[in-house]
Amino acid sequence: MLRARTAKKDFTALPLTECLAKTYRNAHGVTAAGRTVLDHALITGAVAALLLERLPKCTLPFYPEGVDRIVSAHDVGKVCPTFQHKIHQAAGSLGTFPELADADPSLEQDWRGHASISFAALKAVQGNVFIPQIVGRHHGVPPKESYTASCNAYGGDAWQKRREELLALIMGERGWPDVSSKTQALLLMGLTTVADWIGSGELFDEPQKDWAPLVRKAVDHAGFLPLSLQTGLSFEALFGFSPRGVQQAFIEQVSGPGVYILEAPMGMGKTEAALYAAYRMLEQGKAGDRKST
């Protein structure tokens, strides 16, 4: 039996300047409109870029150039009628936008919310199979993949066009990064989730504030600080006793990153030997980046 095709509806999309990503509680204790989706996109991209700066240089080959742009795109799915209805209602501004009058936020349970729209939007505009999954899973669950970017549920062509406008602002003249494997995609999902968490912090609540000077402070507060290492310490200075022969022999064998096995009876100091060997690698710049003191 043939099923009749659902007729395409005519939608009018909000301008990007009115598409909210966040609300916040203002100084009077009232829930108010917070950052726009574009602002939040730029914030999370900047957070991701700073996180990458602070990772050990040896890990950077795992991250494709321009990965911050993927992170910025994670919430493009919030540019849709159901999410905007919900958030403007919370902010007390729903009546200002007749374009949202017929939207029903309760329907989002059918497609698992805005992350699934992000998945569909990215699938529609670029060819890498992993990028839609990265943005679609930034809340830790797989997206609903059976909806297309321009379907009625997601706001039709008008809202997909608005999402494409947002993506164009994020990308500029640059192309999409090349994500080459599922393993790499999983790594980038983690980066996206952490950057979103930091970029959603209260430091960025007030939309009137310039967000750029707050990025470093937010990343610092989240604990992603450069390693500070006091160099030149002896084994005895760290542990209060001179190394045993087996410890000294092990330490001398550790000349670079790798897997080393020290077999010795309990009480011979295997833990201290391993810790001091790791300290030596950090001191020599062979185990990631550090700041010497």
Where are these regions (language model features)?
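Accessory nucleic-acid engagement/destabilization modules that flank
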Residues: 2-230
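Short acidic-aromatic active-site loops that bind/stabilize oxyanions
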Residues: 33-41, 108, 236-247, 267
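Generic beta-sheet signal
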Residues: 67, 258-262, 288-290
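Conserved pre-motif I regulatory segment
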Residues: 230-263
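Post-Walker A helix-loop "phosphate-sensing" segment adjacent to the P-loop in P-loop NTPases
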Residues: 280-290
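Conserved small/polar residues in nucleotide/adenosyl-binding loops
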Residues: 293
